[in-house]
Amino acid sequence: LHGYFTALRKMFASVGKVRFFLDQDSGMRGACLSAFRDRIIGGTCDAFFVRIAKDLTIDEKRRRMRDAKAEFDLYASTMPGLDEDGVRLAMIKDRIQSAQSIGPWKDRWVFMPLPGMSEPEKAVCHLTDLGRYDPDHLAWLYNKASLHAVDSFFNRIRRRSSMLERPVSSSANRGRVWNQSSAYRPEQVAKIQNIIRACHNYVWVPEGKKAERGTPAVRLGLAKAPLTLEDIIYFKSS
């Protein structure tokens, strides 16, 4: 992990501001804070943990969303002059102020108002809070924190390879799971992941009006244009 974040440190050298929204992992925290230490101190890098309830059923997610909406509406009724974004900002600021320090690292978790179906009970912890931001700026940074892009990437990988699909649960089999398409030789999974990684970074171009232009390799300056599979297989330069 440290090598990965060190590589990112070099790639992001010309980037003005860097924000990391990380899954809750102590190794990832240490690697990120170590590799970007100077930029964190200099005020050009921030890191946040993002935590969501991953094991809820659809009905449970809907119930939690209804509860969160009711709480939001009650809070909004005390601030009739604000629109939804203004109420959300005020609510986050209040929750930041009342957050309690937890654990040996004194993490202060803040539950976000109006979480979506994809991120139920979303909570955010600012890992690099040096007291440099005003309350409004800090609240909007909390509001931006999300793992949605990461989850979308994982789902895309699962759809591309049957080996990586989620296991199937059966009520008739006492809740046991069945990995229908699992590889008999685990090393095959690593090979598939390498192929998907190359295609994602160099070949597949995002679609849609809001999609970023080019491939990740093009946006990072590692390639001049999207490649084809033939370019990669036969080592053609771009």
Residue map of PLM features:
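C-terminal/domain-terminus segments
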Residues: 36-40, 46-54, 172-180, 207-232
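Short amphipathic alpha-helical "interface-anchor" segments enriched in bulky aromatics
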Residues: 145-176
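Short, basic/hydrophobic alpha-helical segments
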Residues: 1-21, 228
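Short, conserved catalytic/metal-binding motifs centered on acidic residues
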Residues: 20-23, 151, 200, 228
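Short, flexible loop/turn elements at secondary-structure junctions
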Residues: 24-26, 154, 231
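Low-complexity, serine/threonine/proline-enriched polar segments
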Residues: 1-8, 43-142, 146-153
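A short acidic (Asp/Glu
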Residues: 26-36
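C-terminal domain-tail junction helix/linker
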Residues: 124-125, 140-143, 164, 183-186, ...
